[in-house]
Swiss-Prot record:
Subunit details: Monomer. Homomultimer; when activated. Interacts with TYROBP/DAP12. Interacts with TLR4.
Glycosylated residues (UniProt): N192
GO cellular component: cell surface; plasma membrane
Cell location: Cell membrane
Classification of source organism: Eukaryota, Metazoa, Chordata, Craniata, Vertebrata
Cytoplasmic side, ranges: 225-232
Protein name per the record: Triggering receptor expressed on myeloid cells 1
One annotated GO biological process: adaptive immune response
Amino acid sequence: MRKAGVWGLLWMLFIEEIQAAAEVFEEKCTLAEGQTLKVSCPTNTNIYSNSQKAWQRLKDNGEVQTLAITEGSSQVRVGKYFLEDIPSEGMLQIQMANLQVEDSGLYRCVILGPSDPIILFHPVRLVVTKNSLGTPASDEYPCQVSVQNPTPLPVTTKLRPRPRPRPKPVTQPIPTSADRLSSPGFTVTPTNVTHVNRAPGISIIIPAACGLLSKTLVFIGLFAVTHRSFAS
C-alpha cells in the first residue's frame, strides 16, 4: 500500500511537471479571417486509445472552455470544430474552420479523466487578423501545427567486401640426393669432379718388375748352390 501511494504521488508530480512545461511553451499561429487552423496532437495508443479527447480554449480569466469531445466516435464535428481520433497512428487531428478575429486566444488538446485533464501538446496561441481585401482568405496554405511521432531512422548497412582467403604455404620436404637420383625425369650431371690422368705405361711396368725380381731371386739361389758345391 505504501509503495502504491508513493508511486501515485510521483505520478501526480510528473503530470504536474508536464502541465507546467506545457503552459510555458506555446505554439503561435497567425491566420487571416476565413482560414482554417489544423493541429495534430500525438497520443499514447497503449494508454489512451479508448479515452475521451477534447479541444479546449483557455480564457484570460483562467476559465477553461471545452469546445468539442470525442464521445466514443473517431470523428466529431461541433460547429466549426472538427476532431478525428486515429488510434492506429496515435494522433488526434483538430480543425477550426472559418476563423474570425474573436477566435483569437489560447487552445489545447487534452485527455479527459476523472481529475485534471492530461495535456497532449503545447497550447496553441491563435492570432486571427482581418483580411485586408474584405473577402475570406484562401485555405491553400492553412496554418498547421503538428508533431509527428518519432520514427526510427533507417539503418544503412554497408556491405564490406569479404577478404579473399590467403593461400596457405605448403611445406615440402627437401629432396635428398637419393630422391634426386631415383626420381623419374631427372638427369644426374656430376659436377666438381676431379679427373685423374693415369699413365698408360704403369700397367706394363709393374708386371715386368715382378718378373725381373722373381728371376733375380732364382738366379741368386742357383749361384749360392753352385758356390757351395765348388767349395766342398
